[in-house]
């Protein structure tokens, strides 16, 4: 697929970049005092325009592609759902992980064989993690059209939300895609999105079947009561659920994808409790985001389907919405945060202007880097090339991607007492958009033999090394754990929110 021409960089310019004048600019963003904040802000604003691709999906598929059933994920499939705990007792994987968390607290550990300052610190990390999950668990991230992840706003009464009576039933007053895109992206930022993009709904990435529970089963009684329910598209006016199906209207044409950033320092302690905590808080933020944005869209006269982790494949939607590119580890790597984001999406019939996918060299870089595969504790990440053939039931064949062993990945979670995250922590792009400055993107995309040099510099400077939890607790923390320069790097004005194709 054709993409926008990259800036030219001569051999002489490259020499200056590495050994001369440009070197200071290159190294400065790694933490040297005096880094040019104005230039950094300018570059961040230009990233997506600079790396925009032509219209269409950058995801390569063949005729073997079929919609993927959610039950095939390692989290839910019978072949991977049960894992032994540290005593050898076989349980659902998350219960075995809970046992390990308790063992670590009692032994004064922040993670697997990682001593805490004291038992109090060990407990504090797990307490923060457990608190972080509160909204996610209670608002029903796991199951579609359950609890507060409803496909309609019927149970969210006007009394509860202080909305003018009938606002959600009033026909749309605005149908202009440009105006509506501006409104919805503003609302998305207000609802907590650190990144937001729009894509045309590609049904290939919607699950063929969802994993859910019967509507009359309380969440606390849902264990072992999950059922599979097909997701189908039909000529219906609104999203509905029957006894047999979850039905998305054929008029559902757009998906809004949001990235919710995690705290970098906390994630870089992985696989420790603090990495689990920033993950947990992001999942709860995802739930709140979906609830708020869906209600805004409904009050504008359109329908909206929340999803968080469910309904479809978040990474594929994020790639097509221009948030980033798919990576070797399987996550979406964004220019601003690397893979250190969680993704959620909202499906709607609201007319919107789609964003263009971007290409800033992630595929070429991942082909050579392999740092996530090298550091993966379970060796679940492949060091081989991308293929169309899945390696197990958990992979989707027919899509060109790195095919990883997600059963191995999940198997390490009970051992570590958490959700690992080592691949995200060690990824060079997790440091943020410094890898997009001063010609580095040109080197990655055009000079593949230099990729090992970039990785070597990354290792030599100590990036990707595990952070100490005590230092993180004693360090500075901003609201929601966001980095100090967070909003400068993600600011979006109207002219940036709406780009006509």
UniProtKB/Swiss-Prot annotation:
Q: Where does corrinoid bind?
A: 74, 207, 309-314, 329-332, 341-343, 394-401, 419
Requisite cofactors: [4Fe-4S] cluster; corrinoid
* Entry EC number(s): 1.21.99.5
Q: Which residues form the signal peptide?
A: 1-37
* pH-dependence of activity, as noted: Optimum pH is about 8.0.
Residues in 4Fe-4S ferredoxin-type domain copies: 356-386, 420-439
Top-level taxon in the UniProt lineage: Bacteria
The Swiss-Prot or TrEMBL record describes its family as follows:
Belongs to the PceA family.
Mind telling me what this protein is named?
Tetrachloroethene reductive dehalogenase
Q: What organism is listed for this UniProt entry?
A: Sulfurospirillum multivorans
Q: Which gene name belongs to this protein?
A: pceA
């Amino acid at each position: 697929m054709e993409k926008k021409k990259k800036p030219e960089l001569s051999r002489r310019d490259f020499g200056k970049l590495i050994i001369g004048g440009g070197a200071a600019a290159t190294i400065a963003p790694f933490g040297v005092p005096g880094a040019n904040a104005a230039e950094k802000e300018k570059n961040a604003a230009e990233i997506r325009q600079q790396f925009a691709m032509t219209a269409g999906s950058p995801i390569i598929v063949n005729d073997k592609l079929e919609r993927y059933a959610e039950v095939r994920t390692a989290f839910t499939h019978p072949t991977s759902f049960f894992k032994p705990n540290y005593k050898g007792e076989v349980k659902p994987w998350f219960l075995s992980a809970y046992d390990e968390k308790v063992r670590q607290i009692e032994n004064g550990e922040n993670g697997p064989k990682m001593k805490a300052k004291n038992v109090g610190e060990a407990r504090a990390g797990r307490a923060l993690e457990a608190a972080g999950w509160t909204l996610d668990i209670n608002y029903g991230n796991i199951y579609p059209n359950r609890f507060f992840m409803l496909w309609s706003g019927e149970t969210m009464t006007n009394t509860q939300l202080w909305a003018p009576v009938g606002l959600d039933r009033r026909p749309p007053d605005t149908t202009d895609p440009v105006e509506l895109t501006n409104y919805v992206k503003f609302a998305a930022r207000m609802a907590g999105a650190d990144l937001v993009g729009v894509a045309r709904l590609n049904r290939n990435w919607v699950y063929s079947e969802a994993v859910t529970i019967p509507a009359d089963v309380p969440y606390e009684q849902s264990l072992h009561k999950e059922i599979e329910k097909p997701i189908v598209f039909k000529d219906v006016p609104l999203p509905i659920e029957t006894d047999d199906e979850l039905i998305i209207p054929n008029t559902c044409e757009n998906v809004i994808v949001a990235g919710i950033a995690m705290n970098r320092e906390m994630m870089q302690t992985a696989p420790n409790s603090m990495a689990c905590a920033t993950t947990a808080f992001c999942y709860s933020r995802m739930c709140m985001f979906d609830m708020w944005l869906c209600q805004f869209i409904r009050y504008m006269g359109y329908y909206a389907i929340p999803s968080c982790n469910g309904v479809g494949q978040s990474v594929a939607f994020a790639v097509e919405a221009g948030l980033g590119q798919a990576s070797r580890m399987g996550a979406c790597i964004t220019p601003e945060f690397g893979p250190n984001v969680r993704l959620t999406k909202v499906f709607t019939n609201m007319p919107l202007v789609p964003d263009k996918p971007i290409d800033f060299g992630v595929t070429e870089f991942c082909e050579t880097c392999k740092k996530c595969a090298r550091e993966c504790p379970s060796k679940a990440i492949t060091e081989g090339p991308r293929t169309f053939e899945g390696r197990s039931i958990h992979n989707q064949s027919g899509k060109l991607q790195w095919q990883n062993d997600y059963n191995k990945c999940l198997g390490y979670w009970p051992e570590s007492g958490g959700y690992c995250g080592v691949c995200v922590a060690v990824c060079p792009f997790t440091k943020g958009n410094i890898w997009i400055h001063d010609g580095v993107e040109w080197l990655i995309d055009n000079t593949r033999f230099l990729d090992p040099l970039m990785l070597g510099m990354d290792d030599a400077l100590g990036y990707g090394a595990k952070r100490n939890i005590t230092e993180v607790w004693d360090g500075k923390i901003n609201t929601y754990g966001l980095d100090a320069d967070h909003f400068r790097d993600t600011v979006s004005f109207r002219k940036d929110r709406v780009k006509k194709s």
